[in-house]
Amino acid sequence: MAKISAAQVKELRDKTGVGMMDAKKALVETEGDMEKAVDVLREKGVAKAEKKSGRVAAEGIAAVAIKDNKAAIVEINCETDSVASTDKFKNLVTEVADKIAEEEPASVDDALALKTANGTVKDDVIETTQVTGEKISLRRFQVVEKGADQSFGSYIHNGGQIAALVVLDGADSATAKDVAMHVAAINPEYVNREQVPADRLAHEKDVLVKEALNEGKPEKIVEKMVEGRLNKWLSEISLDDQEFVKDSDQTVAHFVESKGGKVSSFIRFEVGEGIEKKADNFIDEVMNQIKD
């Protein structure tokens, strides 16, 4: 059996970020072959990732990468905010977002198959799982392409808990960034009221009519009252009609128009939205750790 030196163990740990005992075991298993040891650890990393696949990864980072006329907004999840704050995880998010913006994959599976310096994006995710000990997952992304007369604007809030990407027609990137900040803060649902689906509009109107009648309002004034309430609701969910967060004396549409443009589209990601966090009791948590 080959003798394994402390220097070899350190080198392998530096390459992979694993613990001392894991590094030593891999070197013993491969009789000191550094490259094979890296492969062994990566294979064990796959096993770790599969073992952790039942966990809920609801923390993480949302990020935006802009590459020429393309931009990607990405969410990558982990299990705890402490891992989300590590350089290892942050670097993974940055590299994956950049790669997605460059390559424009069609799906998460396609994104995971993209080539990187270490193999593929999936390999990088697995390695991060191995180093951090947590389930890491590329949850979602969108890629947007802009025209020559359009501009991108992005805004990241609270270290990546919220990311917003905006495309403007005719206005500059500084204006787009201001609008992205508004989107991150206010969370509109549509660019303008014309985008609100007809069935949703009809449903809201029906609810408002019944609400007004239940308040005992005379039928002859219900229609006018509902019209006012419906208009207020539309202004609350439509970006163009919202009071601009940096200047409540004007709407977002007026602000952008004053800069010579209009809003084309926006995307907003909030980390963990729609993910139901698993609530383990203390005993279950300890038992799960023992099983790991």
Swiss-Prot record:
Locations listed in the record: Cytoplasm
Keyword list, A-Z: Cytoplasm, Elongation factor, Protein biosynthesis
Pfam families: EF_TS
An example molecular function term from Gene Ontology annotations: translation elongation factor activity
Predominant cellular place of this UniProt entry's protein: cytoplasm
GO cellular component, one term: cytoplasm
Keyword tRNA-binding set for record: no
Coiled-coil residues: none
Cross-referenced InterPro entries: EF-Ts_dimer_sf (IPR036402), Transl_elong_EFTs/EF1B (IPR001816), Transl_elong_EFTs/EF1B_dimer (IPR014039), Transl_elong_Ts_CS (IPR018101), UBA-like_sf (IPR009060)
Annotated region (Involved in Mg(2+) ion dislocation from EF-Tu), positions in chain: 80-83
Function: Associates with the EF-Tu.GDP complex and induces the exchange of GDP to GTP. It remains bound to the aminoacyl-tRNA.EF-Tu.GTP complex up to the GTP hydrolysis stage on the ribosome.
Family: Belongs to the EF-Ts family.
Protein name according to UniProt: Elongation factor Ts
Gene label: tsf
